[in-house]
Amino acid sequence: MQYKGMQMSCEQVVLSDQDRLARANGTVRLRRADGLRINADRLNWQTSGNDAYFEGEVQVKKGNMSLETPSLRFMGQQNQALYQKGGTLRQGSVRIVSDQGTGYLDDEVYSFEGRVTVAHPELDLKTHRCVYHARQDSLALQAPSRLVSLRGTFQGQAGHYLLKRKELFLHSRTEAAWAVMDSRYFVLADTLQVDQQQRSAKARGQALWTDSVRKISLHARSLQFDSAFRLGLTPMFPQNPLVRQGLHATGRVWLQDHSVQPPMDWMTESMQAWFPSSKDSLVVWTRDSSVCKVQEWLMRSNTLLADQARGFLQAEGRWMAWQGLSQMEASGLHWSDWRDTLSMLDFQGPTGISEMADSIPLPVYHQASGQKAKAELRNRTLYRMELQGNTVTLTWNRGSDSLWAALNRTEAARAVFDFENQTLARARYYGGPRGTYQPYGKVKDPQSLLEGVRPQPDLKRALEQSLLDRKGSYPDRGLVQLLQGLPAWDF
């Protein structure tokens, strides 16, 4: 039987001219000149609208597309197929199983709803609604979706996946999109873009990256993960940059590095990093003003480079640090072997140190400055500090009435200070030391004495509060649950 370019064969057919309806049974085959083939057990064909209803082991084939379903409605004028009782579509290496589906055969676009499962040699996908564009070989995800590939597990509330290019884009509406890669890296963000072929990713909007093995967490508004070479990391290129994983974070960056002891908290506006190896900690640096907290140390600087694996830290641009009651300032700093019990601080440029006090007339006990300095630490606590070149020291002495009574001023070529329990214990002066003594009442303007190295407790408190505020601005978005195990998929 032929009608409007359609050819049908079957074992039995009933024609109704009044209803313009053809009912066919028994191995029904429908053929069209463009290559469309539909096989079924039964067919109701409304010839006026060229609509056909197939039932019983329906099989549709056109080119490399095939569909199997218990029942199918085919609308010939729109060249559209629809099923609502479950079906399986195959297109090349893609296999899609769903509760309902619609195929737009002219455009080779297929829409699926209900419980949708996509199988591919390189991925498995579960969702509640998606659209497959066969010509572009891409999936548009229109509902919460979970994708499992060789690289990891990914979930978002919407997005798309380019199968040939192996690129995934996920975004969130109410819950964060997330990824678990290589069973150790956890990424959460408002939007997540992953290139599995290049092994790179971008996360934007309340972004979080966590290495559960190294125990490192990085928060930012935007995160990018790629090889150190493609990121163009500066100021240093790692050896074999193509195979070294790199990170680039921008916007309200907060880093927690617990990979080695002591742990480090770091706050800045942009940061770059790379991994020397899969076992080593990050090498991180920034050219933005930053605040860093390591054990009892609180530091700020304009630039900062830290290598946790080697225990090395370098800071430049008005470096300031606090430990206990002591405050230090310099143009820059090299801190070597900070992970060891014994370590050294090498200060760059004019250096000052001051020590807070808890009484009047001034909230300062000791101030000193020199042209350069170095310090020795034991258990990461200030043990000895040496100032060199035009050293000036101011020391307030306590009187018998428990008030500050006098000011000692000492000038020398070199001064060495010994500390105990994070407070000054002894001072030694070399190179023609000269000293003066003034009662407090004769000091004209004590507030201006060594202004550049006066303690700034308000700044310290403000920096500590900014660290707390930065931490509070990044609430948990599901990381705790992911670390305990992937949540069950709700179908």
Q: What kind of region is each of these model predictions?
A:
Residues 1-491:
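Mature-chain termini and adjacent capping regions
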